């Protein structure tokens, strides 16, 4: 943020096939920030304080979910910015893109049973110290919708062990694993805890009228209350 009185500007990337960019913008606005549309074919990140990669089926999920989006000019610009500390949240397809781009370890594959899953899902917050989860308590259980066909998180045994040992499993499925993810993992973060990827959709849990509650809203307010101050000038 460049001025103390200005709201934080959170960029939301739109790919061909994105579905949830507008819902994400509404969630960002509900959190008190200004959503900024970022087109996949552009590479300008000037003036944004954080970036969200929303859910959907980028480029039709051809080859693999997120496999083509990783080569877009916007993701190419995000990689060095992310490594420099820009907070990034990848939701569902956005999580897949982050893994394909090498910003998070592991991969998201077909759900066990090969069925698309759409339901309200209980989660347990296990890493409340990330840029996007500072508003939650350690061990807090929340309810956020899931909707995906390729949400099964997989990684090599040593990667899984490192994630667990370093406390980088951000949220874990509770009350039934919807997709067969290793160790019930629903979301993870990078080593510096500025990048979070998760399969559940917090943007669909920011209003009692349209979602299962407002448990998702704090994922957007968290980045405003804490980490963005480190990027203010």
Swiss-Prot record:
Domain annotation Glutamine amidotransferase type-1: ranges: 9-233
Catalytic residue positions: 92, 201, 203
Biological pathway: Purine metabolism; IMP biosynthesis via de novo pathway; 5-amino-1-(5-phospho-D-ribosyl)imidazole from N(2)-formyl-N(1)-(5-phospho-D-ribosyl)glycinamide: step 1/2
PROSITE patterns, A to Z: GATASE_TYPE_1
Entry's EC annotation: 6.3.5.3, 3.5.1.2
Keywords on record: ATP-binding, Cytoplasm, Glutamine amidotransferase, Hydrolase, Ligase, Nucleotide-binding, Purine biosynthesis
Catalytic reaction equation(s): N(2)-formyl-N(1)-(5-phospho-beta-D-ribosyl)glycinamide + L-glutamine + ATP + H2O = 2-formamido-N(1)-(5-O-phospho-beta-D-ribosyl)acetamidine + L-glutamate + ADP + phosphate + H(+); L-glutamine + H2O = L-glutamate + NH4(+)
Entry GO CC: cytoplasm
InterPro entries: Class_I_gatase-like (IPR029062), PRibForGlyAmidine_synth_PurQ (IPR010075)
Record localization: Cytoplasm
GO MF, one example: glutaminase activity
Protein name from the UniProt record: Phosphoribosylformylglycinamidine synthase subunit PurQ
Taxonomic lineage of the native organism: Bacteria, Bacillati, Actinomycetota, Actinomycetes, Frankiales
Gene assigned in the entry: purQ
């Amino acid at each position: 943020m460049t001025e103390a009185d200005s709201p934080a500007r959170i960029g939301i990337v739109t790919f061909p096939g994105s579905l949830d960019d507008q819902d994400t913008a509404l969630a960002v606005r509900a959190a008190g920030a200004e959503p900024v549309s970022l087109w996949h074919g552009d590479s300008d990140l000037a003036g944004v304080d954080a970036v969200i990669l929303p859910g959907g089926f980028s480029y039709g999920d051809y080859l693999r979910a997120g496999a083509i989006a990783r080569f877009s000019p916007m993701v190419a610009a995000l990689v060095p910015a992310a490594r420099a500390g820009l907070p990034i949240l990848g939701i569902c397809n956005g999580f897949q893109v982050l893994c394909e781009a090498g910003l998070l370890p592991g991969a998201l594959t077909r759900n066990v049973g090969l069925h698309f899953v759409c339901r309200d899902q209980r989660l347990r917050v296990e890493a409340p110290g990330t840029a996007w989860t500072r508003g939650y308590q350690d061990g807090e259980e929340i309810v956020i919708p899931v909707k995906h066909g390729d949400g099964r998180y997989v990684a090599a045994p040593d990667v899984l062990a490192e994630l667990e040992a370093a406390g980088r499993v951000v949220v874990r499925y509770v009350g039934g694993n919807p997709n067969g993810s290793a160790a019930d993992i629903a979301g993870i973060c990078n080593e510096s805890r500025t990048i979070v990827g998760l399969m559940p959709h917090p943007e669909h849990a920011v209003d009692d009228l349209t979602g299962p509650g407002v448990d998702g809203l704090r994922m957007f307010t968290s980045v405003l209350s804490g980490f963005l101050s480190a990027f203010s000038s």
